[in-house]
Amino acid sequence: VIWNCSQDKDVPGIVSLPMHFKNNNYQTISLGKVYNNFGDGKGSWIKNWRPATTTTNWDYQSEESIRVFEERNEEWLKDPGIHDNNNLPKRGPAYESPDVPDITYEDGRIANRAIEELQHFQDSREPFFLAVGFKKPHLPFNAPRKYWDMYDKKDIQLPSNYFFPKDAPGAARLNWDELRFFAGMPSAGPLPDTTAINIIHGYYACVSYVDAQIGLVLNALETLGLAQNTIVILWGDHGWFLGEHGFWTKQSNLEKGPHAPLIVKVPWKSGGLQTKALVEFVDIYPTLCELAGLSAPVHLQGKSFAPLLDNPDQPWKEAIFYRAGTGETILTGTHAYTEWINPGTGQPSARMLYDHRVDPEENVNVADRPEHKKLIKSLQEQLHQHVKTRDNFFIP
């Protein structure tokens, strides 16, 4: 997946996950941030809703945050430069903690709307596909004060690996512009320690805030008598750095960036199981098809992980793949190998290898050590074959 791609523009006519369920007589509803580009996936939804911000972009609520946002946005509007990805609209603070009710922020309103839709389905008894796209814990880390108060700042520490990996190439560096765009953040260099602790605190608060909203929706499923016939998948669209390797935000080939949470609840299967099997986002589509008893479209590249719900320890994928920028990574049960290819020569211009058995935090790049030459050749062949197959994939 390329950042900020569009389904309608890049793969027009493709049968998306919600469209497939819609074609099979499910009522498909999108609430909140489901597609990155609102309005994308035309024909997939019978309803497509996002809450309007009540104050400014980013839904700031404190008077100070609103003032800072408006002043910076006015500066940007007067900027004669080109308004592109390198000159995005100025943003307000990276975090705030006003004493407001949960519903004041967008995620509270998204949860409320989801409950309303579930109440409708209790009455109609129609099969439904409800996508609830909560925004947190994306930046800015804005959450009601009570969620900040759940954590004592004195207990929050910087990560033990608050440094760039030893022997890693410059291509692996992350400038975390997404955070630098916010008010008060340095345009270059590391965060002051006090600011770094506040950012971590804000992330924790937002996780607890969105956890409460998810709980409201799940409680409604139970109360309305829908839980015993509803499959629930909770997943995030990416991981997040909280100072590991000196990084913040995401968009890195180091594993903290792409590693996302995934929890599945199927009423007729045992709960409480965990697996170390490797799965990918593309596996969710065929998994839901299998669990719902639908045939899977032929264009899918993923593999249903439904069997793991019964036997989480069975042999599974030997490797999965992800990319960030021009970096391509293969992840196995023991190693992560990344290459950046020089387009002129077709050869790697930089590479990384991490042995997760002894270095799960990816602190030491061992790609140039001679004892790993044979392993790298094998991983490289698998990675190149994957990229070739992916880029030449034909969608019927």
Where are these regions (language model features)?
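Formylglycine-dependent sulfatase
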Residues: 1-352, 356, 360-396
